[in-house]
Every structure is written in structure tokens, then in C-alpha cells.
Amino acid sequence: MTEYLLILVSTILVNNFVLVQFLGLCPFMGVSGKLETAMGMSLATTFVLTLSSVCSYLAYTYLLAPLDLAFLKTITFILVIAVVVQFTEMVVRKTSPLLYRVLGIFLPLITTNCAVLGVALLNLNKNNNFVESVLYGFGAAAGFSLVLVLFAAMRERIAVSDVPVAFRGAAIGMITAGLMSLAFLGFTGLVAV
């Protein structure tokens, strides 16, 4: 049980995919303009990351490995991620049309989010079992969501602040992201991974 808690803490805080491993930066910068959009994107990404971790593990363990087709893992994982994203898009469209319109192009772009493929490949490299794969995927998604929502909240506050002209827009966003990364660096050593 302690191992599972360590997996969650390490993926959420210590080895955060956005701020430490620099995966998923496109949606991090693109959707963080408004808190509402960031929360919707974080929910969709959490669902996709967790489900694609499960499906990728199952595809590799029960299809690729027994047939000695491990060299097809990247292509297979991309296909699995695309299917999961399409499923998520259909669910969001049916359950929340407003969120579907707000997320717009960013929802299908989860397919190209390198964090989703990175989680699937890292699960494989770490030789995680099924439960560890699910927790690793969920922890990565929770870490992504935490950082995305915090960053969106900060960007909303910065938008109403008096920022020097040279730093407005993407410049202050990158500076803020760098400071967040330094703050998360403080979690290093919290969990030995």
C-alpha cells in the first residue's frame, strides 16, 4: 500500500510531468488562459491519461509481448491514445456541450499531447504491473491537472495586474511557469524514485 502512495506522490509532486519532465507543455500554455477552461481540460486529460495507461498496459501485456511484437509499441500506443481521445470527445460532447465548445480544438489535441504517450512508454520502461500502471497514469494526470489549474489561476491574476509591456503575454507566462517549476523542485528528495 505504501508503494502505491509513493507512486502517486512521486508522479504528482516530485516528478511532475509538466514542470520536471517538460511533457505536455502545449496544453499547459494553450489552455491556461482561463481557470474554467483549464479545469475542463484537466478533467478530460485525467480521464484520457488514466484510461490510456490501462489500455496501453493491456495492449502490450496481452497482445504485443506474447506475439513478440514489442517493436510496434509506439505505434500501438498512439493508436490506443487516439481511440481513447475519440471516446472521450464523444462522452464530453454528449454530457457537456458547453465544455465541448469551450475546449474546442484542444480536446482532439490531447492525442498529440506528449505526456499521454510518455506515460504509456514510462509505464513500460518501469516494468509497472497493472495497478502500478493505473496509479502512475492517474498520478501523472493529477499532477498535470494540479499544475494546469494553479497556472491558470495565476495567469488570471496576472491578466488584471500591472505587468510591464515587455513582459506581457507569453513572456510573463514563461517566467511564471519557470517559477512554478522552481517551487516544485523543492519536492525533490521527498520520495526516493
From Swiss-Prot:
* GO biological process, alphabetically ordered: electron transport chain
Question: Which enzyme type, at the first EC level?
Answer: translocase
Query: Where located?
Result: Cell inner membrane
Keywords attached to this entry? Cell inner membrane, Cell membrane, Electron transport, Membrane, Translocase, Transmembrane, Transmembrane helix, Transport
Taken from the record, one Pfam family name reads Rnf-Nqr
User: Is Cell inner membrane included in the keywords of this UniProt record?
Assistant: yes
Give TM segment ranges. Answer: 5-25, 38-58, 65-85, 102-122, 134-154, 171-191
> InterPro entries per the record?
Ion_transpt_RnfA/RsxA (IPR011293), NqrDE/RnfAE (IPR003667), NqrDE/RnfAE_oxidrdctase (IPR050133)
Query: What EC number(s) would the UniProt record show?
Result: 7.-.-.-
UniProt membrane topology term: Multi-pass membrane protein
Q: What domain of life? A: Bacteria
Question: What disulfide bonds does the UniProt entry report for this chain?
Answer: none
This protein's GO cellular component annotations are: plasma membrane
Give the protein's function.
Part of a membrane-bound complex that couples electron transfer with translocation of ions across the membrane.
Member of which family? Belongs to the NqrDE/RnfAE family.
Q: How does it assemble?
A: The complex is composed of six subunits: RnfA, RnfB, RnfC, RnfD, RnfE and RnfG.
- Could you identify this protein by its name? Ion-translocating oxidoreductase complex subunit A
